[in-house]
């Protein structure tokens, strides 16, 4: 599939995102964004050059637009309107098997500081559950202001989590194709619906806990999606 054909597929998925509002099938529904320190909308030539060298860090962000989480003895905890961000560092490139590829993973969780204590605990549980192996070794949890938005009609998104995380994305355009063989090469790190690859206008982690900080502007390294858990 050529890069232009791949963008046609992106356009079809975009129409699905816009025309299909969040269904009532799941308990928790909302929007999702991620970025990695390697390209995900790419072809084999770029991916092979980066494997083992880049893509060992990622930012995963969820905004729960509606729904509640079963928290056992605490009962159902309403998470509507709240966000949570998980930032991870891996020993290997987050490639075809995503978070199952690396031998080791360490993560930091940022929870919405508008949440009460029960909601913060539920947000941490949510992130640990839906980040898979990346939710196993959590080295730091901070409550920060989180502003997350994703325009499903234009596919422009933004996440600002305290001073630690900034992520701004847009959909891929024909001029972003370099080798004319681009596709959504690596799948998203989380289970999501109707995902679309995009360009990271700004992707930055400036927090503590992972022993590294990074900035990856202008890379084809992001995904935008909805979720229904």
Residue ranges and their predicted role:
Residues 19, 32, 39, 171-173:
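Processing junctions and N-termini across compartments
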Residues 9-19:
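Bacterial N-terminal signal peptides
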């Amino acid at each position: 599939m050529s890069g232009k054909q791949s963008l046609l597929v992106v356009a079809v998925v975009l129409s699905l995102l816009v025309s299909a509002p969040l269904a009532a099938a799941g308990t928790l529904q909302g929007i999702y964004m991620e970025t990695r320190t390697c390209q995900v909308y790419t072809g084999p030539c770029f991916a092979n050059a980066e494997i083992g060298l880049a893509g060992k860090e990622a930012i995963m962000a969820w905004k729960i637009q509606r729904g509640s989480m079963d928290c056992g003895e605490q009962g159902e905890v309403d998470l509507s309107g709240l966000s949570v961000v998980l930032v991870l560092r891996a020993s290997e490139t987050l490639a075809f098997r995503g978070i199952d590829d690396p031998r080791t993973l360490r993560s930091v969780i940022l929870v919405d500081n508008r949440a009460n204590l029960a909601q913060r605990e539920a947000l941490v549980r949510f992130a640990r559950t839906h980040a898979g192996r990346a939710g196993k070794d959590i080295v730091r949890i901070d409550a920060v202001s989180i502003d997350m938005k994703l325009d499903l009609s234009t596919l422009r998104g933004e996440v600002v989590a305290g001073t630690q995380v900034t992520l701004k994305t847009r959909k891929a355009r024909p001029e972003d194709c370099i080798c004319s063989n681009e596709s959504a090469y690596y799948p998203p790190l989380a289970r999501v619906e109707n995902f679309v690859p995009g360009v990271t206008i700004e992707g930055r982690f400036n927090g503590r806990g992972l022993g590294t900080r990074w900035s990856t502007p202008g890379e084809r390294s992001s995904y935008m999606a909805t979720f229904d858990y």
